[in-house]
Amino acid sequence: WHNEEEVLPLFLKEIEKIYEVMHVKHNVEMEYLFVDDGSTDRTLMFLREQEAENPRVNYLSFSRNFGKEAAMFAGLEKASGDYVVIIDADLQDPPELIIEMYETLQTTDYDCVASRRVSRKGESKIRSFFARMFYKGLRKISKVNIMYGARDFRMMTRQMTDAVLSLREYNRFSKGIFAWVGFN
């Protein structure tokens, strides 16, 4: 994340609620691994404070902004759990879906439960048009079926996470990689 100091306390509060449910309902332990993508605000200071106070909080910090793909990859490399969740801290994705994602992975043969955007409300028509054309064009030139509206918010098994990490591309397009690695 980059310059998320204002939303991080709210995000952490929401994730703590998820932990309480997961711990009580499923006896699950969780680690929260934050990746600070070179923030210039107080994000890093907040993460340091939280790591000192909360044993579930860990973080990585980049010296400058390397971009979302690099931050996601670094987080996947550092994550050690049997299941790994990718979620942005801006609360645009509902953290409570983490519980449903976990329950789905526990009761199916899937290796990944991912979210997708079903509405582009609030976006300009031109942005929506280009987003549709991007996914349509990508599906035409690629053998990988990337779902329209695919988001990075997902939960993956360790096996799928390791498969994603085995692809060492420098210029990553994670949504494509998630679809290509061959897991359900």
Question: Residue spans of the language-model regions?
Answer:
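Short, well-formed alpha-helical segments that are part of the catalytic scaffolds
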Residues: 4-23
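Donor nucleotide-sugar binding loop of glycosyltransferases
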Residues: 4-7, 39, 94
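Alpha-helical transmission elements in cytosolic ATPase-linked domains
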Residues: 10, 14, 42, 46-49, ...
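Short beta-strand/loop segment that forms part of the nucleotide-sugar
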Residues: 12, 23-38, 60-61
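Conserved beta-strand segments of alpha/beta enzyme cores
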Residues: 31, 56-58, 184
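A conserved acidic beta->alpha catalytic loop
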Residues: 36-44, 91-92
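Acceptor/aglycone-binding surface of glycosyltransferases and processive sugar-polymer synthases
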Residues: 49, 56, 60-64, 68-78, ...
